[in-house]
């Protein structure tokens, strides 16, 4: 990889994002679609932009992302995690601010499996005393 590009892998739930930061004007491209086209929900777009706004690098980089697996929320979280890692590769002094905001830590929460005899992971059938 060239020195003009920084890479970060982000994961959240079952989603995985590969993020490339290149010097540019602030374009964010996800699976060859713009951020606004890829994410219909404003909250998901906001989550993706959080590390850039925190480090004040919104219009400093063009970001190219390939993301797979999971749903909207998981993919947005994975992209945020990937951008955070790529920013730390670009400039290690940003780590402290990103850590305090909670973006560096991989959110380890996963879906709990369904158990035999239960309706869902924890929901039980109605109990009848008689």
Swiss-Prot record:
The keyword RNA-binding does not apply. Keywords: Ribonucleoprotein, Ribosomal protein. One of its GO terms (molecular function) is RNA binding. PROSITE patterns: RIBOSOMAL_S9. Gene3D superfamilies: 3.30.230.10. One of its GO terms (biological process) is translation. Belongs to the universal ribosomal protein uS9 family. This is Small ribosomal subunit protein uS9.
């Amino acid at each position: 990889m060239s020195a003009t590009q920084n890479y970060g892998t982000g994961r959240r739930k079952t989603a995985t994002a590969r993020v490339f930061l290149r010097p540019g004007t602030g374009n964010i491209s996800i699976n060859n679609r713009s951020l606004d086209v890829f994410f219909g929900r404003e909250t998901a777009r906001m989550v993706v932009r959080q590390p850039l706004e925190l480090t004040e690098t919104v219009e400093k980089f063009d970001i190219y992302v390939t993301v797979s697996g999971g749903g909207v929320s998981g993919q947005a979280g994975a992209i945020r995690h990937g951008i955070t890692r790529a920013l730390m590769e670009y400039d290690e002094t940003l780590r402290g601010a990103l850590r305090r905001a909670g973006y560096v830590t991989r959110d380890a929460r996963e879906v709990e499996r369904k158990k035999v005899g239960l309706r869902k992971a924890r929901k039980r059938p109605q109990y009848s005393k008689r």
